[in-house]
Regions:
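Structural motif
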Residues: 4-6, 32, 61, 123-125, ...
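Conserved phosphate-binding/catalytic region of the ribokinase-like
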Residues: 102, 106-206
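Conserved N-terminal subdomain of the carbohydrate kinase-like
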Residues: 1-37, 58, 206
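Conserved beta-alpha-beta core of the PfkB/ribokinase-like small-molecule kinase fold
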Residues: 32, 37-111, 133
Length: 206
């Protein structure tokens, strides 16, 4: 059915990422950085990620793409990440998990998103709902787009391509609604291709 599943092993190299002068120098130059929860399962990498985020410029987009995998996350990791982020990317299944974890399972989707946006003073919250569309919540505004109907070959890379093209569009000065549209269209195209990193047609980039 084209839907991915993962078996993630422990003790990987990315569990032990050191914080180096080179990494600190890179952080100070960033216009955007995307981070998730999985690489934070080990304290070494988690501390490096937090130090990297703390070293970024004030106007850097710090995107927490929550990306819950197996049991490699905790409430504390999610809260600490949200404190450092100014953008959150989450899908509808993850939102249910977070709703239970944070103690508001009975709220509807939109109210959960508005609550998280306000509580953690985020600039944006991006919610993807598979075939049921996607939302971008920002302070005082919401963008909703339906998911294009396509012949799905492989969903691996769909979320990352959405996030990457959305963030690149925002950095290039596109309004949020237009950046959202580009993200949706690129993600839909990636779903029609085998593999996570197909060549993106130029027509989809603008």
């Amino acid at each position: 059915d084209g839907v991915a599943s993962y078996d993630i092993k422990e003790g990987s190299a990315w569990d032990n990422i050191p914080f180096t002068p080179e990494i600190e120098a890179l952080a100070k130059q960033c216009r955007a950085v995307c981070f998730g929860s999985l690489a934070q399962r080990n304290k070494v990498s988690r501390d490096t990620i937090y130090r990297f985020l703390d070293a970024t410029p004030k106007d850097c987009m710090r995107i927490f793409d929550i990306n819950l995998r197996q049991n490699f996350y905790s409430k504390e990791i999610i809260q600490e990440s949200l404190k450092r982020a100014n953008v959150m990317k989450i899908n509808d299944e993850e939102l249910v998990t977070i709703g239970r974890m944070f103690g508001y399972p009975g709220m509807d989707v939109e109210n959960k998103c508005w609550l998280i946006l306000g509580k953690y003073n985020l600039d944006m919250l991006v919610l993807t709902c598979g075939v049921n569309g996607s939302y971008v919540f920002s302070k005082g505004a919401m963008s909703y787009l339906e998911t294009p109907k396509v012949e799905v070959a492989d969903t691996v890379g769909a979320g990352d391509s959405f996030t990457g093209s959305f963030v690149a569009s925002v950095l290039n000065g596109k309004p949020i609604a237009e950046a959202h549209r580009i993200g949706v269209n690129v993600s839909a195209y990636v779903c029609t291709q085998n593999g996570a990193m197909p060549v993106i047609p130029e027509a989809l980039k603008s």
